[in-house]
A protein has these predicted regions:
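Extracellular polysaccharide-degrading/modifying enzymes targeting complex plant/algal/animal polysaccharides
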Residues: 1-136, 141, 148, 154-157, ...
């Protein structure tokens, strides 16, 4: 099965060209993207190479994506089912609920079902973006929600973004410097 979509569907963020990367992430000699494909509420596994998806399907369905300047093409295996008669979904957004800037304090998010976000890797040394996240805000109440199918992070309460994101070289010193910068940030780390 294959679908080709215009890149305009994704706007300025295309999860099928967005690689998972960052401090303490080991890609194991293959690319991993923040995009995903779902069949009836379950995700398929990203294949490392297109040939893996073109082979007969095994027990676990696979998908693979390619992005050029105009189009995104996604191949997927749907063993034993016609995807045109099932619920097939893809990620198109990085987050579901995430403020556009830090300092959006005292927000309550209660009673929602939130799914399918193409979130980046969220080490303690980079801006932590989740399917739902506070973006360096305080006083939030996040309760009685269903949060699922986020590539890297479901709920993120952590770090603001800065030019030092993912530059710690996986060291304790880099981690400590991140904490020092958090205390010195324009919106300081406080209760």
């Amino acid at each position: 099965w294959r679908v080709t979509l215009p890149n305009s569907l994704f706007g300025s963020f295309n999860p099928y060209s967005d690689l998972i990367r960052g401090d303490w992430f080991n890609p194991k000699d293959r690319p991993h993207h923040t995009g995903a494909v779902y069949l009836n509420g379950h995700w398929l596994i990203e294949a490392a190479k297109l040939d893996e998806v073109l082979k007969p399907a095994g027990d676990t369905g696979l998908w693979f994506g390619q992005v050029d300047n105009e189009r995104t093409t996604i191949w997927a295996q749907f063993k034993g089912v016609n995807p045109n008669e099932q619920l097939v979904e893809i990620n198109v957004r990085r987050t579901v609920f995430y403020p556009d800037q830090p300092g959006r304090n005292y927000i309550t998010v209660r009673g929602f079902t939130m799914r399918h976000a193409a979130t980046p890797w969220a080490p303690p040394t980079a801006e932590q973006i989740g399917l739902i996240g506070t973006h360096w805000s305080k006083g939030w109440i996040i309760e009685n929600n269903v949060v699922s199918h986020s590539i890297c992070s479901g709920i993120a309460l952590g770090k603001h973004g800065d030019e030092f994101d993912n530059t710690s070289a996986n060291t304790a010193e880099g981690y400590v410097k991140t904490i020092e910068r958090a205390h010195a940030h324009a919106i300081p780390w406080s209760k």
